[in-house]
Amino acid sequence: MSFRLNGVGLTHANGFAALKGITLLAEKGERIALIGPSGAGKTSLLSVLGTALEPTNGLAEVFDCDQNFWGPSAIKALRARIGTVHQSPPIPGRQRVVTAVLAGKLGQWPAWKSLASLVYPLDIPGARAALERVDLADKLFARCDELSGGQLQRVGIARVLYQQPELILADEPVSALDPALALATIRLLTADAEARGATLVASLHAVDLALGNFPRIVGVKAGRIAFDLPSERVTVPMLHELYASEGEQLPIQAHEPHFLSQVPANDAATRAKCC
């Protein structure tokens, strides 16, 4: 098991209930896409899974360690096994790209090696290899504030590829990329997770990226799970209901103009196709 959430709720300090009664289980090696409108709770859900936030109620378990035992040492050990891709990577602008990538293993290295690597990169070949996978090898020694938003996102992905964690949590990892590059990058992440037997949970705005690349889809709306289904059982009416607050148009990447024609039009079509 990678994680288990049982009736998890999360209320922020301002009183806003971001998550309400979330129950979710992921076995090792699953690839799950979180979809839903802005403000649905996807980022909060990923934050709980990454131990950045502790549930207000309910129970969260990550790698068989439940939140009652999330002390400093336990959290440090868990985070060494978790890789997070942020929508806006928290990378200092003056930091070199090579250092940002190597930071992926700071939690796995002894303290002396982590400190030394911040001064002088200790695994330049490893960082270069990770950057090559996202077509940024030429930026190895560039400063991070010289990069575009899309390039910074790819540096964040290279850091996770270098880290090789057991659980990857990706929060809108390709939001700043053009459609073709977004598709290639999502395929890179899913292929890496599949090859290593790692668990991947990614929140995505574009439903075609989610349905076309992830076997399991979790729809999140107003802090609750609206549905949790194999991708082939998600129907057009389900998607429209999920995104009703954002208008009639579903969020779809431009590289899949005929995407909706491949999605079951209703539940009956889904049952006929899947059962």
Curated annotation (Swiss-Prot):
GO CC aspect terms: plasma membrane
All copies of domain ABC transporter, residue ranges: 3-247
Record key words, sorted: ATP-binding, Cell inner membrane, Cell membrane, Membrane, Nucleotide-binding, Phosphonate transport, Translocase, Transport
Disulphide bridges, residue numbers: none
Compartments it resides in: Cell inner membrane
Highest taxon in the source lineage: Bacteria
Molecular function in Gene Ontology: ABC-type phosphonate transporter activity; ATP binding; ATP hydrolysis activity
Binding site for ATP: G36, P37, S38, G39, A40, G41, K42, T43
Membrane topology listed for this record: Peripheral membrane protein
Main location: membrane
Family annotation (SMART domains): AAA
Catalysed reactions listed for this entry: phosphonate(out) + ATP + H2O = phosphonate(in) + ADP + phosphate + H(+)
EC number: 7.3.2.2
Function, in words: Part of the ABC transporter complex PhnCDE involved in phosphonates import. Responsible for energy coupling to the transport system.
Family, similarity comment: Belongs to the ABC transporter superfamily. Phosphonates importer (TC 3.A.1.9.1) family.
Assembly notes: The complex is composed of two ATP-binding proteins (PhnC), two transmembrane proteins (PhnE) and a solute-binding protein (PhnD).
Listed name of the protein: Phosphonates import ATP-binding protein PhnC
Gene source species: Dechloromonas aromatica (strain RCB)
Lineage of the organism: Bacteria, Pseudomonadati, Pseudomonadota, Betaproteobacteria, Rhodocyclales
Gene name, Swiss-Prot/TrEMBL: phnC
